[in-house]
């Protein structure tokens, strides 16, 4: 997760909204599940009010709405992500980067994985877990429609 998050932040310099960062990581996870048959990272997403949120990523952002990427200490992600994974993230980022965080939020809240998980409001919402299987199923449906 940290490698994915750092690579996306680096591409969004100088500022990225936490919402946009969360949603792009969600799209990376969903497409990776469908195309490669396994998750990009182990962490789970939860159905929060404005769409999928990975609590661990939320903690990395310190709960801030905006992240000044110039104040973030960047690390070399190559030990965490091989070339294939880095390229995969860059491709998904390229598709979804033109959208705002709110637009991405609207898209993700139309997914069954979000609708069926319940809607939590904070990291302690146990009933809001979006299973990787339900995310996978949503992205299979999306892939079949394109």
Predicted regions and their residues:
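Domain-edge interaction signal
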Residues: 4-5, 9-146
């Amino acid at each position: 997760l940290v490698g994915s998050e750092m690579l996306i932040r680096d591409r969004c310099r100088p500022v990225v909204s936490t919402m946009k960062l969360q949603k792009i990581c969600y799209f990376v996870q969903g497409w990776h599940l469908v195309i490669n048959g396994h998750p990009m990272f182990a962490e789970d997403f939860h159905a929060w009010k404005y769409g999928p949120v990975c609590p661990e990523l939320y903690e990395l952002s310190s709960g801030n709405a905006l992240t000044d990427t110039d104040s973030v200490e960047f690390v070399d992600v190559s030990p965490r992500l091989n070339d294939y994974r880095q390229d995969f993230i860059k491709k998904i980022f390229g598709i979804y980067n033109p959208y705002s965080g709110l637009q991405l939020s609207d898209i993700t809240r139309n997914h069954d994985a979000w609708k069926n998980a319940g809607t939590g409001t904070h990291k302690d919402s146990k009933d809001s877990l979006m299973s990787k299987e339900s995310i996978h199923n949503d992205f299979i449906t999306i892939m079949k429609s394109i």
